[in-house]
A protein has these predicted regions:
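Conserved N-terminal phosphate-binding loop of PLP-dependent enzymes in the Aspartate aminotransferase
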Residues: 2-452
Length: 452
């Protein structure tokens, strides 16, 4: 049987360098990679591509193949690769000032002021290193503030890999309980027993079930934790009125509403998805786009909740938190993102891609459609609407998506091989990039339509 890599070689791609590096890496790194999203079991079979370099909207692998890059590091490369303003700010800071001091700098407050000015729901903000940390702090803070224990989280969402939330990301439906009463399914072994007792798992986009759950359990619920746009089961938009209902229900019962904007923050607009959609959460977490390619995250929100951090009731600590490199990168990134017209131009290129892909698929009579908001989108090979994780499991054709990915890769267009990831667009992408992408898409769609 022909493997995916055989198909790439036949299409004129040489990836033997990646094959050799992967074999060597497997001898010293478990699975040959340092993140599950790059692993063979995440779709990179029989091995992931090994990168030589990136520049702007392009990425080059070790075998010299060049791609229009819509993977973008899974989201943080909002400006594309090696953006001059961010890179220069980091190099300048290292050369002139240092890296880690274990003491504050004036740059931290300047960054906090920019975040607060950009995101209306944030009165105060604390920095950290990763989205996982930011979510951990937000849920801990919500529990401390409300003096309650339970967290509502939604099937199909990813909020980092801490024990308290690494549940029901993509569970087997047979193990996940009935549609209207899901059970918590651990992402894998090693989770302490009893953690799931403080989790309430719900399907997304079901306002009535959320209302019924809060009516029944409200006095025990500390927080509702959600992405404002579902980004870890492909791209799924909130149904009209759903987030508004969530906000009203949580506010009425004194439940902290936490928006995980690790992916959407500073990507869907300077104020994130919450500003774009007009919803004001109590706490928010940010990462990815905040650093313009450098590792930095933040958690912020209402002043009365954040006061528990100010007085030491809830501890947030870390040697590398607010290190000079991360803060310099984030300050430069937010300055660049504040450029007048930047998001309008980014949305225009993104809309051209999204609408163009939809037209290509429609003209090929493929059972597929494109869902997205601004520079975030995914192709669903499905005939039924997908509103939550279980819809995706039941209706999305993963095999056709795989063939779509292979065909696009062979034609120099890169995105993640998993249908539950997304295509990301950067400010470096051009109308010419979109035209080349759509030309490749027409060829692949025609091949898929013939059943090849």
């Amino acid at each position: 049987m022909m493997t995916a890599i055989d198909a790439r070689l036949i299409a004129g791609m040489n990836t033997t360098g990646s094959a050799g590096l992967f074999e060597a890496a497997c001898r010293v790194i478990p699975g040959g990679v340092n993140s599950t999203a790059r692993a063979t079991w995440a779709g990179w079979t029989p091995y992931p591509l090994f990168v030589e370099s990136g520049q702007g909207s392009r990425l080059r692998d070790v075998d010299g193949n060049e791609y229009i890059d819509y993977l973008l590091g899974l989201g943080p490369m909002i400006f594309g690769h090696r953006p001059a303003r961010v890179t220069e700010a980091v190099v300048d800071f290292i050369q002139k000032r240092g890296t880690v001091f274990a003491l504050p700098t004036a740059d931290e407050a300047r960054l906090a002021e920019k975040i607060i000015a950009a995101v209306p729901s944030v009165d105060q903000v604390r920095l950290c290193n990763t989205g996982t940390e930011a979510v951990l702090y937000a849920t801990r803070l919500a529990r401390a503030f409300t003096k309650r224990s339970k967290i509502i989280r939604f099937e199909g969402m990813y909020h980092g890999f801490s024990d308290g939330v690494y549940w029901s990301k993509h569970p087997a439906i047979a193990k996940a309980g009935p549609d209207d009463h899901p059970v918590a399914v651990a992402q894998g072994p090693g989770m302490p027993k009893g953690v799931e007792e403080n989790l309430i798992i719900l399907p997304w986009n079901d306002a009535q079930l959320l209302a019924d759950t809060i009516e029944r359990e409200g006095d025990n619920i500390a927080a509702v934790l959600t992405e404002p746009v579902m980004c870890n089961t492909g791209c799924i938009l909130p149904q009209p009125g759903y987030l508004e209902a969530m906000r009203e229900l949580t506010q009425r019962r004194g439940i902290v509403l936490i928006f995980d904007e690790v992916i959407t923050g500073f990507r869907l607009g300077l104020g994130g998805a919450q500003a774009r959609l007009g919803i004001r959460p109590d706490l928010s977490v940010f990462a990815k786009g905040l650093g313009g390619g450098f590792p930095v995250a933040a958690m912020g929100g209402r002043a009365d909740i954040m006061a528990l951090v100010a007085n030491g009731t809830v501890s947030m600590a870390g040697t590398y938190t607010a290190n000079g490199i991360a803060v310099a990168a984030a300050n430069a990134a937010l300055d660049e993102l504040a450029t007048p017209g930047l998001y309008a131009r980014l949305d225009a290129v993104s809309d051209e891609l999204r609408l163009g892909l939809a037209q290509v698929l429609r003209e090929a009579n493929l059972p597929a459609y494109v869902v997205g908001l601004g520079p975030l989108m995914q192709v669903w090979f499905a005939t039924q609407p997908i509103h939550n994780y279980r819809d995706a499991e039941r209706h999305a054709d993963q095999e056709i998506f795989r063939r779509w990915w292979e065909g696009m890769l062979a034609r120099g267009v890169l995105f993640h091989p998993g249908a539950y990831e997304n295509l990301f667009v950067s400010t470096a992408h051009t109308h010419a990039d979109v035209a080349a992408t759509l030309a490749a898409a027409r060829q692949v769609a025609a091949t898929l339509a013939r059943g090849a």
